[in-house]
Amino acid sequence: MAASSRAQVLDLYRAMLRESKRFSAYNYRTYAVRRIRDAFRENKNVKDPVEIQTLVNKAKRDLGIIRRQCPLSSGIKSHAQGLQQRQHAVGPGCAVWKGCGMEEPSPKIMGHLNL
Amino acid sequence: MLLRAAWRRAAVAVTAAPGPKPAAPTRGLRLRVGDHAPQSAVPADTAAAPEAGPVLRPLYMDVQATTPLDPRVLDAMLPYLINYYGNPHSRTHAYGWESEAAMERARQQVASLIGADPREIIFTSGATESNNIAIKGVARFYRSRKKHLITTQTEHKCVLDSCRSLEAEGFQVTYLPVQKSGIIDLKELEAAIQPDTSLVSVMTVNNEIGVKQPIAEIGRICSSRKVYFHTDAAQAVGKIPLDVNDMKIDLMSISGHKIYGPKGVGAIYIRRRPRVRVEALQSGGGQERGMRSGTVPTPLVVGLGAACEVAQQEMEYDHKRISKLSERLIQNIMKSLPDVVMNGDPEHHYPGCINLSFAYVEGESLLMALKDVALSSGSACTSASLEPSYVLRAIGTDEDLAHSSIRFGVGRFTTEEEVDYTVEKCIQHVKRLREMSPLWEMVQDGIDLKSIKWTQH
């Protein structure tokens, strides 16, 4: 399998930033965006293809985490924190806890968790 | 009607697939106050969020009290809260095996953060339980030959309380004083060690003033005098590099919810070579090597393990960032306000915990004025009483300065905007409160407050 090309890494970077912006919690959102930018910037001069592949794999795993966690944090209603101007728009309503008055765990979430 | 609602929901889901365009985190910090509109659970309605929204919650600047869960930690915990719910001590079926595998993996993650062997990690319900096990367990095991313990005056309440309860059992405890900087005097420690001392307990990073004790030196002293060394590392684990072998630590307490893990879980490190014997506090089925019976809560320990792993990876990045933000906070406050004192040694100090005393301002009133920021004066466990913190008293702070101290916490998720906002509000309110203060007026007129003879009525 060929090592990840520059284009693939950039696609991954863009996808991660895009997904991170969907966190409704201000602190998680700002952390994710900042961390992703800093991590990709820090590793931009890595030349060893094995190391690049390791980093790309880790980034893919983290992208999966962000995809799973964003809807969870949006689905649970909570008042926005300090610096937000408006309650962040909610993604497709899938929450795990029935007690919060939300629907059944979405098959999308369960699929992601490989359950 | 139902059909239309369902169609609308589906339409939102489709258009929301690439991610709804979020309102970018704002630069202009307008805190809007609206009424508490009851939130309906239908997502379609909130896509067009009303301008008059709910009251915004305060900024969180109290990370020494507790920390939010890192999303990576929650992601690791969820499968064990949903489907993999087996008891890790069930030996006969797959539910038990997979739960046990997760527990052992978490143990390995915790151990590698502190340089220990996984067999030396025992899961508990938190650092308070770990401290109790360490102090009472060691003291009681060696009760026949050793009756003396040493600790400091700035320890966490659970350590001080455990020592007090041991005193009631007939043990002797020396509470070492600390210097003005908050650090103990190593010569005093050496002088306090007696032939019948079983344990020295000194916390690594203080939760109120952020002072770092010289753990490596204390470890060296204790191991040379053959005394066990316990450290409450709840505020230090995952934030500064710790190695139990380099620092000659025999027992260490770890707390889950201080390192972006779940609440209700912690761990205790108990050295095996040379073996530290501990009398178990909690009797039962012999789980956790007999030292802490009870079913190990798999989702919580998986969370603790994940938090430790994330902390290990992020330690350098977080430390650099937190140091920068902390510098920014202190510099900006101190250059705009006179008569601000930072409690604790500025050099041997963990940057994320900043304790400032604002002279001529009452701490509680400043806290209430800063209602948009979640802060604390002193530690959460003592915040209910009106007494000034015993830690500040131990470092020799004047009574009036002790009453006016505020603890700012900077953590992994704190942003520069939050720090700037906190600084701005703090300066504004301190100035306003000082304007109202007659003491401040007198100081401005050049009167030395210490020379005043207050009359009795």
From Swiss-Prot, chain B:
Pfam family, one: Aminotran_5
Record-listed N6-(pyridoxal phosphate)lysine modification sites: K258
Post-translational modification summary for this protein: N-gluconoylated.
PROSITE patterns the record matches: AA_TRANSFER_CLASS_5
Binding site for [2Fe-2S] cluster: C381
Modified residues (Cysteine persulfide): C381
Alphabetically ordered keywords of this record: Cytoplasm, Cytoskeleton, Iron, Iron-sulfur, Metal-binding, Mitochondrion, Molybdenum cofactor biosynthesis, Nucleus, Pyridoxal phosphate, Transferase, Transit peptide, Zinc
Residue numbers binding Zn(2+): C381
A cellular component annotation (GO) from this entry: centrosome
Enzyme superclass (EC): transferase
Residues given in the record as pyridoxal 5'-phosphate binding sites: A127, T128, Q235, S255, H257, T295
Active site residues of this protein: C381
A GO term for molecular function: metal ion binding
Superkingdom of origin: Eukaryota
Keyword hit for Protein biosynthesis: no
Activity regulation info: Active only in complex with LYRM4.
InterPro entries noted in UniProt: Aminotrans_V_dom (IPR000192), Aminotrans_V_PyrdxlP_BS (IPR020578), Cys_deSase_IscS (IPR010240), Cysteine_dSase (IPR016454), PyrdxlP-dep_Trfase (IPR015424), PyrdxlP-dep_Trfase_major (IPR015421), PyrdxlP-dep_Trfase_small (IPR015422)
Enzyme Commission number(s): 2.8.1.7
Listed GO biological process terms: [2Fe-2S] cluster assembly; [4Fe-4S] cluster assembly; Mo-molybdopterin cofactor biosynthetic process
Cofactors, names only: pyridoxal 5'-phosphate
Cross-referenced Gene3D superfamilies: Aspartate Aminotransferase, domain 1, Type I PLP-dependent aspartate aminotransferase-like (Major domain)
Homology family: Belongs to the class-V pyridoxal-phosphate-dependent aminotransferase family. NifS/IscS subfamily.
HAMAP family according to UniProt: Cys_desulf_IscS
Protein name listed in UniProt: Cysteine desulfurase
